[in-house]
Amino acid sequence: MARILLADDDARQLQLRARLLEASGHEVSLAGHASAVIPYLATSQVVIIDLRFPNSQGQPDAAEGLKLIRQIRESGCRAPVIVISGWPEDLSGTPEERMVSRVMQKPVAIESLLGAIAELVIGDSAPS
């Protein structure tokens, strides 16, 4: 299965998604804030992030997620990025929108997320 980096500032959602992905056979690394993502990129086959992370005032801010997307790509990481957000319109029309492989609106059914992972990652390495 896939090595997945999962990043979300909501610890409850982070743990829940991690358990569901691990139960499906995936290896999951967790990042509870945007600054914790970069060290895991080299070993991740897919990156799944929330869009809104706390800004310097502690308020949820899509600008933090957009900055994270740029940092992921500037690091040289070519892994598919899946954005899961309650506000996908925050990404719409931005340059960062072209840097991600999939945008999914919360709440996301685990079956939909697993399907996206299979399509973006596992499908690329499946025997023909």
Regions found by a protein language model. Name each.
Residues 95-104:
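As written
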